[in-house]
Amino acid sequence: MAFRHLASAKLKTFFVLCAALLLVHAMIYKVPSLYENFSIGSSTLIADVDAMEAVLGNTASTSDDPFDVWNSTFSPISEVNQTAFMEDIRPILFGDANETRPHCNQTPPHLVGPIRVFLDEPDFATLEKIYPETHPGGHGIPTECVARHRVAIIVPYRDREAHLRIMLHNLHSLLAKQQLDYAIFVVEQVANQTFNRGKLMNVGYDVASRLYPWQCFIFHDVDLLPEDDRNLYTCPIQPRHMSVAIDKFHYKLPYSAIFGGISALTQEHVKAINGFSNDFWGWGGEDDDLATRTSQAGLKVSRYPAQIARYKMIKHSTEATNPVNKCRYKIMGQTKRRWKTDGLSSLKYKLVKLELKPLYTRAVVDLLEKECRRELRRDFPTCF
């Protein structure tokens, strides 16, 4: 009797294990993935063609001549010697403009759709070994063809080295596959100042523009990692909100007018909206201000389909030097009146250091907080 019970128990266990294996097999090979417009059969991803057409439909056509749009008529950064320093390193950083290779295809040939997100934290020496083809300053160029888009990635930064290494790992992997002529500019604010994301974006645009004839600029938070390689970091027809679906927000827009996280604009767009506001010291407001000035300039914010424009956000704690800006709503309430005079046209800063790191260009800047707050107090006397 005991033997029959034991045999029966083993038989039940066997059937349970078989059922579990069949269920796992079905989940892997038959069930649609989390990406709504993908299905998985074996290990082959079948993309929704309409989604990719929407991406390409939002990509601007660019000039065949890589240097014909370079407008070098910029005002001095703040001191003449800084501008001269940039002129000296420009040929070292970006080399010769002569090209004999064919242009890259409009659709990069090696895209697969959803990709692995690297969350490990390799040190810089390891990353340099992983991406040996990257030129000084974090400049990547395709070797087999001439890139159709010249893109500067602007990253506002302070005291998040682990996040920076993770982001560099993910971005270099993605951007090389997309056959872009790109460089990553990390704009680092000096210590003992309230963080100012919008102004750092303006500084990054200003510094990057002096080094190379970029066609477009992608303003990129350090804690956002792309999940799909069809999310092209190319020049947009209209200003593009790129971080449409973020895991922290359950891959949904928190609100319809959001324009934060990652935004892509051509040089013409940036000039038309006068860049970002310089006046949002602390957390919040500058992204909504950006949306308002984009609308005021007669432009519209575009987005890729949510199943492509997906990001993972690296978790982080609240930073003492980035407190909530309690005056953000008062400043935002005046954007329609102030946007033409608050931005690139009023940008003041001091370039402390410019370094060509193997994987990125590092610009350390003093945003002159005390001086700028005194000027801002005239418009908002109860805030500062």
From Swiss-Prot:
Which top-level group of life is the source organism from?
Eukaryota
Disulfide links within the chain: 104-145, 216-235
Which controlled-vocabulary keywords does the entry list?
Answer: Disulfide bond, Glycoprotein, Glycosyltransferase, Insecticide resistance, Manganese, Membrane, Metal-binding, Signal-anchor, Transferase, Transmembrane, Transmembrane helix
Pathway(s) per entry: Protein modification; protein glycosylation
Membrane topology reported for the UniProt record: Single-pass type II membrane protein
Extracellular side of membrane: 36-384
Q: Name one Pfam family in it.
A: Glyco_transf_7C
Tell me which InterPro entries the record gives.
Galactosyl_T (IPR003859), Galactosyl_T_C (IPR027791), Galactosyl_T_N (IPR027995), Nucleotide-diphossugar_trans (IPR029044)
The protein's Enzyme Commission number = 2.4.1.-
Principal localization reads membrane
Q: Transmembrane residues, as ranges? A: 13-35
Can you tell me which residues bind Mn(2+)? 223, 316
Identify the residue ranges that face the Cytoplasmic compartment according to the record.
1-12
Using the UniProt annotation, give the residues that carry a glycan (glycosylation sites).
Answer: 37, 71, 81, 98, 192
Name any cofactors this protein relies on.
Mn(2+)
Listed under GO biological process in this entry are: carbohydrate metabolic process; glycosphingolipid biosynthetic process; positive regulation of Notch signaling pathway; protein glycosylation; response to toxic substance
Q: GO terms for CC?
A: Golgi apparatus; membrane
Q: Name one GO molecular function term.
A: metal ion binding
Compartment list = Membrane
Q: What class of enzyme is it?
A: transferase
By sequence similarity, the record places it as follows: Belongs to the glycosyltransferase 7 family.
Q: What does this protein's UniProt record list under function?
A: Catalyzes the transfer of galactose onto proteins or lipids. Required for susceptibility to pore-forming crystal toxins in conjunction with bre-1, bre-2 and bre-3.
This protein is called Beta-1,4-N-acetylgalactosaminyltransferase bre-4
Ranked from the top, the taxonomy reads: Eukaryota, Metazoa, Ecdysozoa, Nematoda, Chromadorea
Gene that specifies this protein: bre-4
